[in-house]
């Protein structure tokens, strides 16, 4: 059965590839048990301690060892030499299951040249063996046990309800709107009162400064009204003096010169 195969055949192997090169390359896939180089055939057999090492190594077919791209495939008919018993005992605890995607990422980080589809094959391998789904299932199981999602949702809803309750009890939103509206109306009224008093605008210099300050606070409406009043001044000097508002008396420029 292919699932029990621990050896792979490396074809198209460069004559310059050494045993060290081969071992370094395949050590990312798993613990290498033995390497059998067939120099006359430009190939080699690599045997791993675990079947997963061989399965992961096949995903690296098309990568380069030394200066040449190689072909890697399972070797079910190859009989590896028996490993020393002492070596097996000493290294048995070091075998770990690792994701193929991690293997590919590590090799790329080390500068190995891999096949263009190595990453895709590694992801498919992990999904097939349930590495990704197992991790996702673990998170879902934990979420189900402690109810994290429900707690976060409930917490958010509670905060929103509290905010609404405070707003309804104290009418924060409506009161804020009312304050802005009242302030806007007050400034507008003050601007209108000054602007209607044309005598003050024409006869007293400090009134112009006061008007500018009020008009600026009132906004564009006050500014447009001011321009309209100033435009009408030259054509109606007599009317402004004859029809004075109740409570006002004429002020002549001569009075200012005496002072």
UniProtKB/Swiss-Prot annotation:
Interacts with ACD11, PR1F2 and PR1F3. Keywords: Cytoplasm, Membrane, RNA-binding. Residues 6-77 form the RRM domain. This is Binding partner of ACD11 1. The keyword Magnesium does not apply. InterPro entries: Nucleotide-bd_a/b_plait_sf (IPR012677), RBD_domain_sf (IPR035979), RRM_dom (IPR000504). GO terms for cellular component: plasma membrane; plastid. GO terms for molecular function: RNA binding. Gene3D superfamilies: 3.30.70.330. Residues 232-243 have a biased composition (Low complexity). Disruption phenotype: No visible phenotype. It holds the Pfam family RRM_1. Its main location: cytoplasm. The lineage of its organism: Eukaryota, Viridiplantae, Streptophyta, Embryophyta, Tracheophyta. GO terms for biological process: defense response to fungus; negative regulation of plant-type hypersensitive response. It is found in: Cytoplasm; Membrane. Residues 219-259 are annotated as: Disordered. The keyword Acyltransferase does not apply.
């Amino acid at each position: 059965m292919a699932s029990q195969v621990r050896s792979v055949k490396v074809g198209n192997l460069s004559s310059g590839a050494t045993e060290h090169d081969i071992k370094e390359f395949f050590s990312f896939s798993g613990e290498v048990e033995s390497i059998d180089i067939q120099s006359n055939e430009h190939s080699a057999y690599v045997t791993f301690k675990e079947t997963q090492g061989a399965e992961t190594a096949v995903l690296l077919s098309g990568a380069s060892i030394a200066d040449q791209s190689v072909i890697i495939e399972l070797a079910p008919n190859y009989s590896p030499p028996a490993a020393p018993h002492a070596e097996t005992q000493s290294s048995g605890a070091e075998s770990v299951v690792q994701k193929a995607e991690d293997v590919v990422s590590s090799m790329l980080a080390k500068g190995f040249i891999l096949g263009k589809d190595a990453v895709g094959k590694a992801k498919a391998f992990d999904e097939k063996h349930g590495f990704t789904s197992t991790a996702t299932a673990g998170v879902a199981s934990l979420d189900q046990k402690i109810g994290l999602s429900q707690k976060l949702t409930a917490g958010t809803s509670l905060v929103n309800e509290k905010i609404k309750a405070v707003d309804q009890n104290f009418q924060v939103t409506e009161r804020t709107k009312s304050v802005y509206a009242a302030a806007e109306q007050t400034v507008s009224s003050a601007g209108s009162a000054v602007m209607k008093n044309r005598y003050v605008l024409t006869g007293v210099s400090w009134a112009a400064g006061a008007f500018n300050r009020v008009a600026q606070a009132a906004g564009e409406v006050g500014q447009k009204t001011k321009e309209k009043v100033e435009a009408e001044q030259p054509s109606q000097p007599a009317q402004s003096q004859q029809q004075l508002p109740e409570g006002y008396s004429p002020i002549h420029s001569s009075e200012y010169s005496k002072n």
